[in-house]
Amino acid sequence: MKKFFLFFVIIILAVYSITAEESEVPFTVLITEPSDNYSIAIEYTEMLSEARFIYSCDSKLFDEIDAIKIVRDRLINFTKEKGYYSYSYLRPTITKTDYATHKTYFYSFVLLKQ
């Protein structure tokens, strides 16, 4: 009985080690354009051709129109840099304010097209 149990455990471990895969998130985080007033972080997933642009600045200085313009300009440049020809938005943009750090974040979710 002990041999059968040991054999069963070894088989289970062998099957598990063969089928187990690492679950890494394929994000590449690029922090670009750090300025005195704002910064932009880009999380790009090449496998899915998706990008998330995160614009952040001080809450007192935040203007949504400026955020849209800056993110759109950076998005156009990023699209050309990566060899894509167009893009579309995956979902509506999100604006969040962190009152503890007095920062406002503007999120834009994009699907890049070839």
Located regions from the model:
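C-terminal segment of classical bacterial N-terminal signal peptides
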Residues: 14-19
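Sec-dependent N-terminal signal peptides
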Residues: 4-13
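Secreted/extracellular ectodomain signature
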Residues: 20-114
